[in-house]
Amino acid sequence: MEITSSAMLKPAPTPTPHPLAGEKVPLTAFDRAAFDVFVPMVFAYRAPAPSSEAVKEGLRMAVAAYPLAAGRLAVDVAADGQGRRRRRRVLHVNDEGALVLDATVEADLDAVLAANVATDLYPAPPEHSFGAAVLQVQLTRFRCSGLVVGLIVHHHVFDGHSTSAFCTTWARAVRDGEAFSVPSPCLDRAITSVPRSPPAPVFDHRSIEFKVGNKSSDSSGAAAAAVEKITNIGVRFTAKFVAELKARVGGRCSTFECVLAHAWKKMTAARGLKPEEFTRVRVAVNCRRRANPPAPADLFGNMVLWAFPRLQVRRLLSASYRDVVGAIRAAVARVDGEYIQSFVDYVEVADARGEELAATAAEPGETLCPDLEVDSWLGFRFHEMDLGTGPPAAVLSPDLPIEGLMILVPVGGDGGGVDLFVALADDRAQVFEQICYSLEEHAIPSHL
């Protein structure tokens, strides 16, 4: 791997400046609850792939349509409602641009696809997010003329829905070239966090999305763990396998629900947990349609909260797929308009009191056992990531530095297959690989 160039790519010029030019946009309640990390995505394209110049020009046009992607995270000092001067995190919309690296590899793309390893194929996340480009891209050319597009985006700026919208806009800009035109997305992030008057939180968000003060261990069992003791593995569930899971659930069931139910069962079994322990899954829920009133579908930013289906280990491992899916659905249903408004009100009250809120999201190197966290990319429109020569040949697994974190990715061309990428403790990963294709619903390890 050789990095051949590094440059800051400015947005393409527009006829009129966008309305947020130069603004310091405060992070919303949803931004502040999100991971304070860069999130990687890696797309592989077989030859013939578009030129790097075409990909970069498309990126310039996409960033012009999404100007927040060209900004920088910063700390600002402003007066609160009581007239007190307080530090706050902001996104400075300064058009400094996206960082773009060019790289070459003296190898064929097929070798990378066979290994499904994305190491070094996306920019290394900076140690500090303040002042760094919130969007960073690496274009890696292979000996066979294949191309890998690896990017990292900061989660305080992009949630998964926003990342999908941005990436598909970028691909369209590459395809359309000078003819590219796209309506501006909704950039008014503040509409997500309007409190009631007076604010009236009714749920205990301090134990769910936030902690007051510095982050510390919580009921999820998160504890420090050396990243080198975490193994990243990937397994593929074919469309036929997913159909069998759905048949076992019966009735209407989404791919996400049935695969999550299966993965929760098998990972819990692989971990060898005690029967009386409880295990839960942190499930990201897009709140755009669930809020009251709903937010625009094209809102660019964060608008995600989490559901927490929770079961005792003995019950989880003995339950039918139908029952486990029911527990997942019930937890997700609780993230409704009232819950979302309560969350917004809670942050407003905490800010008025001068409380420092720390997100409960896990940090790199932590272990979630006995719990899990799932991030679904099943709604990502990967087929629209066509840069003009066809959709990606593969979406490669990024490094997952948190034990118990899993990502669900649709399999291109499989008509319903799912790739599951998961990070598990070294001594548990092999066990999971041995049992992950078993469809025994009520199998309980002998020690339970």
Curated annotation (Swiss-Prot):
Residues 1-20 are annotated as: Disordered. GO terms for molecular function: acyltransferase activity, transferring groups other than amino-acyl groups; hydroxycinnamoyltransferase activity. It is an enzyme of class 2 (transferase). Coiled coil: none annotated. Gene3D superfamilies: Chloramphenicol acetyltransferase-like domain. The keyword Acyltransferase applies. InterPro entries: CAT-like_dom_sf, Plant_Fungal_Acyltransferase. Keywords: Acyltransferase, Transferase. The active site is at H155 (proton acceptor), D386 (proton acceptor). Its EC number is 2.3.1.-. Belongs to the plant acyltransferase family. Hydroxycinnamoyl transferase that catalyzes the transfer of an acyl from benzoyl-CoA to tryptamine, to produce benzoyl tryptamine. Serotonin and tyramine serve as acyl acceptors in vitro. Specific for benzoyl-CoA as acyl donor. Has no activity with p-coumaroyl-CoA, caffeoyl-CoA, or feruloyl-CoA as acyl donors. PANTHER family: TRICHOTHECENE 3-O-ACETYLTRANSFERASE, TRYPTAMINE BENZOYLTRANSFERASE 2. This is Tryptamine benzoyltransferase 2. It comes from Oryza sativa subsp. japonica. The lineage of its organism: Eukaryota, Viridiplantae, Streptophyta, Embryophyta, Tracheophyta. The gene is TBT2.
